Amino acid sequence: MANTPSAKKAVRKIAARTEINKSRRSRVRTFVRKLEDALLSGDKQAAEVAFKAAEPELMRAASKGVMHKNTASRKVSRLAQRVKALKA
């Protein structure tokens, strides 16, 4: 248990940051899920639109420290491959 005032404040800050990160991670998952649905339905136009919406969300999460930048780049790359394969 946090005893010093600074430790108590740190606990509050960590709790607030955790909530923000959960929200950002959930938002990323939602955008990726919409893209997955578009890919599975085979709708090229919807997949393209969903990809253009999901990519900045992934990179924003990386820049905010929610996920590592290499993880975000890998996810973007793999999703782009799938969108490209759908268009071909």
From Swiss-Prot:
The keyword Transcription does not apply. Belongs to the bacterial ribosomal protein bS20 family. SUPFAM superfamilies: Ribosomal protein S20. GO terms for cellular component: cytosol; small ribosomal subunit. Keywords: Ribonucleoprotein, Ribosomal protein, RNA-binding, rRNA-binding. One of its GO terms (biological process) is translation. It comes from the Bacteria. This is Small ribosomal subunit protein bS20. Binds directly to 16S ribosomal RNA. InterPro entries: Ribosomal_bS20 (IPR002583), Ribosomal_bS20_sf (IPR036510).
